[in-house]
Amino acid sequence: MIKEITAKYNAEQIEKKITQLWKDSDAYRKTREHRKTGKRLFFVDGPPYTTGHIHLGTAWNKIIKDSILRYYSMNNRNILERPGWDMHGLPIEVKVEGVLGFKSKKDIESFGVENFIEKCKEFAINQKQEMTEQFQRLGVWMQWEAPYMTLKDDYIEAAWWTLKQASEKNLLDVGKRSVNWCPRCETAIADSEVEYAERTDPSIYVKFKIKGEENTFIVIWTTTPWTIPANVAVAVHPGFEYSKFRAIRQDGSDEILIAATDLIENVLRQGRYVDYEVLETMLGEDLTKLEYESPVGDLVPVQNEIKHGIYLADYVTAENTGCVHIAPGHGMDDFNVGVKYNLPILCPVGPNGAYTEEAGEYAGKNVREANPIVIEDLRKRNRLLAEGTVTHRYGHCWRCKTPIIYLATEQWFLKVTDIKDKMLEAIDAVDWYPEWAGSARFRTWVEGARDWCISRQRYWGMPIPVWKCKKCGKLEVIGTKAELLEKSGAGSDVELHRPYVDKLTIPCECGGEKKRVEDVFDVWFDSAVASWATLKFPQTREQFDEWWPADFITEGHDQTRGWFYSQLGASMVGFGRAPYKSVLMHGFTLDAGGKKMSKSLGNVVSPIDVIDKYGADTLRAYVLSSSAPWDDLKFNQEEVENVHRSINILWNVFRFPLPYMALDNFDPLKVSLDSVKDALREEDRWILSRIQSVVKAVDEAMSGYFLHKAVREILEFTLEDLSRWYIQLIRPRTWTEADDPDKLAAYRVLYEVYVTLTKLISPFMPYLAEEMYQNLIRNVDPNALESVHMCDWPKVNEAYLDPELEAAMSTARSIVEAASNARQKAGRKLRWPVSRIVVSPESEDAAKAVERLRSVLMDQTNSKAIVLTPVGESWDELGLEVIPDPSKIGPVFKKDAGKVIPALQKVDGFALKKAFAEAGEFELSLADRTTVTVTPGMANFKETLPEGTASAESDAGLVYVDANLTPELEAEGYAREVIRRLQDMRKELDLVVDENIRVSVRIEDERVLRLVETLKDLIAEEVRAEILNLGSDIDVSGALVKDWDVEGIAMKMGISKK
């Protein structure tokens, strides 16, 4: 049977109880098994790095996923999902380095690669367990006992198979290119891994001396002085006009400079020249015959071996000088120019960001620390035209936050540029939520994508499965562990990690020996293969053929250049199509001011802290309702508390009828809706219609992943329709006799609504939904499904839908609100009855609503009558005051205006208004018996209310409250005041609903006492008083005695249990 619940919503208690219930009943497995015959839905979880505690962003991400999957499950989808864990790469290595106190790769080498690998593995596995428990506390249902983990050999094989496909399709390339490089981590990083942040760097203008021309220089600008020792050329735009001009200083000295004609003024300003003379103009292509000298040739000997020329490049912009310094070893654009013109790829910088011996005098210096040294050397040699600083967005390593540099190194690449067109076609075949996530943001990223550098010079990662013969240089790509074991002749199994896999060699046809290249995969390649690796492909095709590609994925908008992109690239290589059918892109979590959360700013919010304080359902409901999924979520503590209050209201709504239902032994299995249909009131039919409308609205919202609309719809229904309206309407019905059909109808309707609401909230607030379900359904029906999450999603029952009634009730609620406002103006509380409410409707629909819901209006406005005026007509008891307008009367009647104004004030307002409307004028009799003609505009009109009446506007029209008191109304008002205080005292004594009491009330004011005595029976009935003593001088005693001021009247009340 239905049981009472605690008065207060205790999230911690409920969540512990439900977690244990799910565990004991094996609810997750049974729910998935229950849907095995449904339509398949394959979901791939974007794997978080196992680096520690979950943060608010990862919590939001998992909550979105869980809510959507629960919704799909209830809609009979057979779901395959496995939580994923990204367990390799710099994210893990950097954490472990921090634990071990390491500063560089040298520390790792000294510690031992195998030792370091084991530490990384241990860290990743331990953190996975901790994060799993945190996600489970969020109420997230996934196959936590069988996740996919990127460190597992079978997972690594999926990546190896994909790379072999790339090799066989000529989409794998190896070679020297200038790539993003982290000098702390000493590895290449992909474009998608570069994080941009504001940084202040040097800004210098440098003069390169033109060979064979005295005192003549071409001027370049750079923010990386450290790259000057690696300069091999200057690039100019073929279509720009350039000038050779004499630049004159204040002291009369001069020099001849070359720059874009449009930028001469900037060069003069930067160099503090006072005048200039153009000697010659030319196009960029005319400059290519010139050569120049390195400004640091005496410091960097290798520079003297280079023929420094000027070359054409379309990417040169009309900024600074229009001439770009080219160092092919330190920039992708520079590298491409170098390749195009067969220039030397000079890269005198080592992997740790320090100059090599090739840098001459700069050898051993860190390049960033060398900036001021290079600048000073240029100054000493009169090659520094100007020096300043610039604050700009500059790339940093995504994990250690070190500013990147560009280094020309040998790397492995997927030739994305060869399949870019097919990738763009694949994007169009995917359903994107929102649409612009694919058509704009993602498409733009792919259009600008370069070949993907998939190699990393690190340790803890999936080894790149390429074996190279040291003798002949032949390469072999291995696709599976079995292939490796066979070709290497290994006698036993091997773990597919460094350094273990590095020990296996493969005989080469030339008689030499192939050894594995040392690089590991870019960690983004790990997760790129998740959709087939989680299906155990390529070990088996069974699951892959049944489920792949993924029906749905969702991640943050940074994944347009991360996981969405890496998956698409790898899948196009492996299968020639997108690995997902639909994608929901969500936003970032920020603080209330819109700033990114970071420890340095002290604005980080822990989801676990929020759960500890408010509960998981509150956090879930908040993050889901706060904003559209694709907008950034600005975490606001006050809004969290508002959601918590809403859930408390939901709990109280749920709790309200339970004591009465339990007391009356209400059994919903024995009372069907059909059996009470004749006892249904309009408000019952209305709430049944409203819950259908809510189901429809939530369904529509979920179809487009408007999760915020879905949750808001539910919370608003609970607060506005249930708590503030329907519960108030039916409250008196729950106090009647147990077998009263009117009460049973209210119980059965409320039960129906609760059952539907329980299922509606279950994807979003799973703990609370389960608690409600177990009490309302499982306690009533032993044959019911074990969990609410096994239930079917509610279907709209068209028989209950009544849009006309919903509109009418909306009108009625507006009238009630207006009546409340009018009561406030009249100084009459709602507890005090009024004789009548007058409604002056503006439309027939409004009038019909009043007629249809008259009893509701009488009850909720606490009035004895509802008076309805004819549509469009004023209430006939209103007065119409005439207000003369002296500004219009004076110019017409001049000295007689003083007679006209008082005469107008005495005229019947309705007669005057009618004359103006029908005749356009009015003959006005003055005090001296003369008449004058007045016209519209000379008078304004103001409605006047009968004494003791107040009014307010509603959506239906004007509402009037007659607040005049009769003795009968006053008696009821005082009686209601007494009842309210006695009810409060019952609550204070924590009495059960049906417990009878003894009451004594002393009212010293004899007149008020006589009024209250006329309703003694009503008071006794309402407060369940078996004995009620009233008097002006009686002794008041009991378990609880209190003094009260009731509308200025002193009263003393005492109550005791019977």
Curated annotation (Swiss-Prot):
Enzyme category, top tier: ligase
SUPFAM superfamilies per UniProt: Anticodon-binding domain of a subclass of class I aminoacyl-tRNA synthetases, Nucleotidylyl transferase, ValRS/IleRS/LeuRS editing domain
A Gene Ontology biological process term: isoleucyl-tRNA aminoacylation
Signal peptide residue numbers: none
Motif 'KMSKS' region per record, residues: 596-600
InterPro entries: aa-tRNA-synth_I_CS, aa-tRNA-synth_Ia, Anticodon_Ile_ABEc, Ile-tRNA-ligase, Ile-tRNA-ligase_type2, M/V/L/I-tRNA-synth_anticd-bd, Rossmann-like_a/b/a_fold, tRNAsynth_Ia_anticodon-bd
Gene3D superfamilies tied to this protein: 3.30.720.200, HUPs, Isoleucyl-tRNA Synthetase, Domain 1, Valyl/Leucyl/Isoleucyl-tRNA synthetase, editing domain
Keyword vocabulary terms for this entry: Aminoacyl-tRNA synthetase, ATP-binding, Cytoplasm, Ligase, Metal-binding, Nucleotide-binding, Protein biosynthesis, Zinc
Chief location bin: cytoplasm
One MF annotation (Gene Ontology) recorded for this entry: tRNA binding
GO cellular component: cytoplasm
Any Pfam family matching the protein: tRNA-synt_1
EC annotation from Swiss-Prot or TrEMBL: 6.1.1.5
Required co-factors: Zn(2+)
Subunit structure: Monomer.
NCBIfam families in the record: ileS (TIGR00392)
Function: Catalyzes the attachment of isoleucine to tRNA(Ile). As IleRS can inadvertently accommodate and process structurally similar amino acids such as valine, to avoid such errors it has two additional distinct tRNA(Ile)-dependent editing activities. One activity is designated as 'pretransfer' editing and involves the hydrolysis of activated Val-AMP. The other activity is designated 'posttransfer' editing and involves deacylation of mischarged Val-tRNA(Ile).
Family label: Belongs to the class-I aminoacyl-tRNA synthetase family. IleS type 2 subfamily.
Stated name of the protein: Isoleucine--tRNA ligase
The species this protein was found in: Methanosarcina barkeri (strain Fusaro / DSM 804)
Gene name in the database record: ileS
